[in-house]
UniProtKB/Swiss-Prot annotation:
S-adenosyl-L-homocysteine binds at residues 18, 61, 66, 100-101, 139-140, 156. This is Monomethylxanthine methyltransferase 2. Binds 1 Mg(2+) ion per subunit. Belongs to the methyltransferase superfamily. Type-7 methyltransferase family. The keyword Magnesium applies. Its EC number is 2.1.1.159. Keywords: Alkaloid metabolism, Magnesium, Metal-binding, Methyltransferase, S-adenosyl-L-methionine, Transferase. The record marks 154, 266, 330 as: Involved in substrate discrimination. Its cofactor is Mg(2+). It holds the Pfam family Methyltransf_7. It comes from Coffea canephora (Robusta coffee). Mg(2+) binds at residues 178, 260, 262-263. GO terms for biological process: alkaloid metabolic process; methylation.
Length: 371
């Protein structure tokens, strides 16, 4: 099975669907001030036709209500900043392209659009037709839009997904080179770490180059991704997932070879690695780069560690179940996340269960002829 066929969130609206379980409202709340500042700089840059329309894309949009939470924040930021900066002008039409892989459940988003448009008109005064939302399926590691056609590109929790599992893991190091691990965890051998970093560098460089070509000169890009932290004893969600799968091997429910032959196409970069790749690629100026933390159970009101742990397990399952099921089989998925919840219940009370996040705002450098 092709990797892109299983790189999608759980579909539909069931208990383990992405629509029901993914909750990154706190991350969006932390990102919003940066989003508003990015939009403010964009409107001041006087890009082509920006007073008439603004063309935006959300790269790696996923599915369900969270997709439209991002869209809402983008629209609200454009309207708020527009009123502050150019209140004598009419609101520009906003065209938003939702991008994800072909297998993404776009229909779950489209079903929400009628109520979303009505709410936008009620709360923002935006008449239906002044905000146009459509899908642009395809890998964001390839061309999506014509050259110099976009004003603003946004991506949240997507660029840590690689285009493929690093080929060097099998070709150069051999099957099982990443023994006992499912990604480039802290305990991996240096050659495994290098293989993952090399793949991320290649993919992220391609991402920057291709999308810089799609942006107008001085266009903006705002990226939020999971990043490495300095805490030696912290556990991210993939660490807990790895521990859960290892439990099944130790208990005899899963063959060791099955674990050793599985590697997630995910790399969690450091802030310095991201900064260096952007500078080396050269198409963008870094306007600002900051990091922040989000607890796994942030915003969860029930004060019960086991219920919180089940909630975290459901959220992580919504993201990783398709790719796990394609390798390990669907039957063992409940067992994986039952053990995941047990590990989560241990780290949550200690404050060690959180995501480190990086947010970076980029401006496309002008062509020499534009200077």
């Amino acid at each position: 099975m092709e990797l892109q066929e299983v790189l999608h969130m759980n579909e539909g609206e069931g208990d383990t669907s992405y629509a029901k379980n993914a909750s990154y409202n706190l991350a969006l709340a932390k990102v919003k001030p940066f989003l508003e500042q990015c939009i403010r700089e964009l409107l001041r840059a006087n890009l082509p036709n920006i007073n008439k329309y603004i063309k935006v894309a959300d790269l790696g949009c996923a599915s369900g209500p969270n997709t439209l939470l991002t869209v809402r924040d983008i629209v609200q930021s454009i309207d708020k900043v527009g009123q502050e900066e150019k209140n004598e002008l009419e609101r520009p039409t906003i065209q938003i392209f939702l991008n994800d892989l072909f297998q993404n459940d776009f229909n779950s988003v489209f079903k929400l659009l009628p109520s979303f448009y009505r709410k936008l008109e009620k709360e923002n005064g935006r008449k239906i037709g002044s905000c146009l939302i459509s899908a642009m399926p395809g890998s964001f590691y390839g061309r999506l839009f014509p050259e110099e056609s976009m004003h603003f590109l946004h991506s949240c929790y997507s660029v840590h997904w690689l285009s493929q599992v690093p080929s060097g893991l099998v070709i150069e190091l051999g099957i099982g080179a990443n023994k006992g691990s499912i990604y480039s965890s802290k305990g991996c051998r240096p050659p495994v770490q290098k293989a993952y970093l090399d793949q991320f560098t290649k993919d992220f460089t391609t991402f920057l180059r291709i999308h810089s070509e799609e942006l107008f000169s001085h266009g903006r890009m705002l990226l939020t991704c999971i990043c490495k932290g300095v805490e030696l004893d912290a556990r991210n969600a993939i660490d807990l997932l790895e521990m859960a799968i290892n439990d099944l091997v130790v208990e005899g429910h899963l063959e060791e070879e099955k674990l050793d032959s599985f590697n997630l196409p995910v790399y969690i970069p450091s802030a310095e690695e991201v900064k260096c790749i952007v500078e080396e690629e050269g198409s963008f100026e870094i306007l600002y780069l900051e990091t922040f933390k989000v607890l796994y159970d942030a915003g969860f009101s029930i004060d019960d560690e086991h219920i919180k742990a089940e909630y975290v397990a459901s959220s992580v399952r919504a993201v990783y179940e398709p790719i796990l099921a394609s390798h390990f089989g669907e039957a063992i998925i409940p067992d994986i996340f039952h053990r995941f919840a047990k590990h989560a219940a241990k780290v949550l009370p200690l404050g060690k269960g959180f995501y480190n996040n990086l947010i970076i705002s980029l401006a496309k450098k002008p062509e020499k002829s534009d200077v």
